[in-house]
Structures are given as C-alpha cells and as structure tokens.
Amino acid sequence: MAWRHLKKRAQDAVIILGGGGLLFASYLMATGDERFYAEHLMPTLQGLLDPESAHRLAVRFTSLGLLPRARFQDSDMLEVRVLGHKFRNPVGIAAGFDKHGEAVDGLYKMGFGFVEIGSVTPKPQEGNPRPRVFRLPEDQAVINRYGFNSHGLSVVEHRLRARQQKQAKLTEDGLPLGVNLGKNKTSVDAAEDYAEGVRVLGPLADYLVVNVSSPNTAGLRSLQGKAELRRLLTKVLQERDGLRRVHRPAVLVKIAPDLTSQDKEDIASVVKELGIDGLIVTNTTVSRPAGLQGALRSETGGLSGKPLRDLSTQTIREMYALTQGRVPIIGVGGVSSGQDALEKIRAGASLVQLYTALTFWGPPVVGKVKRELEALLKEQGFGGVTDAIGADHRR
C-alpha cells in the first residue's frame, strides 16, 4: 500500500514535468547533472513527498540501480589505507540512509568509497511514531527522531549473505562495508544486544560501529560514560576476537557532538586502553545552534546537516588530540563540499561521511565533493588525502 502511494506521487511528478520537459529532464537525471538535481529535481521531489517517503523512495531507487552512475574517476590522490583496508576514496555514506542493507550496490555505483548500513538492532522494531523526520531547507538541515527502526539482525544477515562474495571482491578493490549496530528500545542488557550484533553481522562486515550516540533511544547516550563504555566495549571486543580470524572486523565507536570536555577525555581514555580500532565523530546534535531559520527547528530529535558541520569538526579536532592521532577517525556532520571534507581531514579525520547533503543536492554531490577535495589537496600542496590527515595539528 505504501509503495503504491509512492508510485502515485512519482507519477504526479511525471505529469507536472510534461512531455518535452520530461525528456530533457530524463537526460539530465541520467547524466547526473549537478545543477539540475540541486536546483530542480530535488526541490520538486521535496515539494511532492514528505521526508520519510522521499527517503524510502530514494532507497528503493538506489537498490534498483535507477540512479546516474558516478562520472568522477577516483585518482590515486584520494586513496586511503586505514582500518586494515584500502579505501578507493575517503567519502562514505553515513549510517541512516540504508538502515536495512537494501541498497549497498547502488551506493557504490553512486561513487562512495565505502558504505555503512544500519543502525541494525537484534530484533525488528518500528521505531518512533510518524512524523519523525523534518526538513529545514533554509538551513540545509534535517531533524530526525527515527528511533532505530530496523528490520533486525536476521533479515539484514540474509541480505548481506546473498552478496557476500560480491562484497569480498569490492572490499579487495577498495570499497569496504561497515555495519552500524544499535540496541533494542526495550532491551535490559545493552551489552548483549551489541554482542549479538557482532556475532551475527561481524563475519559479513569490514568494520562494525558501536552506536552509543543516537539521541532518539532513551538512555543510549549514557553508555558513553566511562564505566559503562568500558564494560560495553570489553564485551564487544571479546565477541569480535572470538570470530574466525579471516572474519574479524575493525570495531569503531560512534560518539555524540554534545559531550563535555570530561566526557571526551573519558572516551579517549577507554578507546586507547582497550585498543578500539577507530572513532566515528559525530552523530547528530540535540542542540539548536543560534540562527536556525527552519519553521520546524524546534522539533525533537537529532539535527544534521550544515548547522552541525563546525561542531563536528571541532569534536574531531579534540578527539584527534586526545588520542595523539593514533586512533583513526571517520568524520561526519555537515559535509556537502570538498572544503567541508578537507576541513575534517585536516582536523584529524582519515575518512569522511555524508548523508544529509543527498537530501538537498542528490547523488551528484558525491562526485562534487571528491572533485573539489582533489583540487584543494593539489592547491594546498598535499600529495594525497593521507598527507592531509591531522595537518592542522602540525602547524
């Protein structure tokens, strides 16, 4: 029923575009024209579809490969070796877009250097009631309170196993896969939820993410406390180390931007003590920066997009310093240009992710970020991404 509704809305869009206009628009869509997506197609879709319906339609189209193939060719300058793998380019899709592992291959086709799916919870759950996603177009931002809606480990495992051999080849070619793990809303043992995720999906992932920073599951962020985090990660690492050596993924922790200085010091201490493989910095923010213009800015949930950019970059800078640059960081939050990506890399990120930018600019934004990043690396005298990692700390 829901899919028929989405098809009807898409048909309405076809009628609006009209015959000759549709033909030209189809050409621009197929070629991935950046201006057409940013100035015409994406605003039109936003006018026709509510945010969650648009999200579901985007996942559906991506899963079917009905998107322009990336035109930008990755150069050697963009290659990064980190977390035990080669990354063809440092721009990945953040968790939250493909929550259930339905569109992995389409996302690689879009030009991402790595894909992260999830968050995946042990048991299926619906998440919070709708509406739960809100656009702030004036701010190039989104507020969401999805609440870990998930198909569950069993369904996602089935999907990933069906393409396991294909993924092994992609990983070898520099296109790794990450899986973001969450806990069920009603769970009384968070550590066991994450451990179960490691057991089931660990053998199918190149890296796992322990997501303790979503603001939309009650009590989740308290797991970032020093004692709670140490207990949780100790169990997760025990489960990971119990997997067959050939299937032992890296383990990363995803943290919030809304942390005190003491919180950050404690997290850095635990991460170094236990030998965690990396950090993802940051999740969405519950803060509302001054100057937000969107009418829905007061909605409850996590804010992502442009208003998060500087806060996440500063958190990257601090975590890089606190870990002496020895713990790889994936930087996420407000990336929509090569400049945004390079700022995070110079602050200490080895890789970056984006998601909200797709909402406003469409698939061509991936190639745009990579093209601009390469140009800036050359302009600033870097031989490649690797040379720029943490550069601001060496000035």
UniProtKB/Swiss-Prot annotation:
It catalyses: (S)-dihydroorotate + a quinone = orotate + a quinol. Pathway: Pyrimidine metabolism; UMP biosynthesis via de novo pathway; orotate from (S)-dihydroorotate (quinone route): step 1/1. Residues 31-395 are mitochondrial intermembrane. Its EC number is 1.3.5.2. The uncleaved transit peptide is required for mitochondrial targeting and proper membrane integration. The active site is at 214 (nucleophile). The keyword Transmembrane helix applies. FMN binds at residues 95-99, 119, 180, 211, 254, 282, 305, 334, 355-356. Belongs to the dihydroorotate dehydrogenase family. Type 2 subfamily. The identification of DHODH defects as the cause of postaxial acrofacial dysostosis (POADS) was obtained via exome sequencing, demonstrating that this method is a powerful tool for identifying genes underlying rare Mendelian disorders. Exome sequencing consists of targeted resequencing of all protein-coding subsequences, which requires around 5% as much sequencing as a whole human genome. Monomer. This is Dihydroorotate dehydrogenase (quinone), mitochondrial.
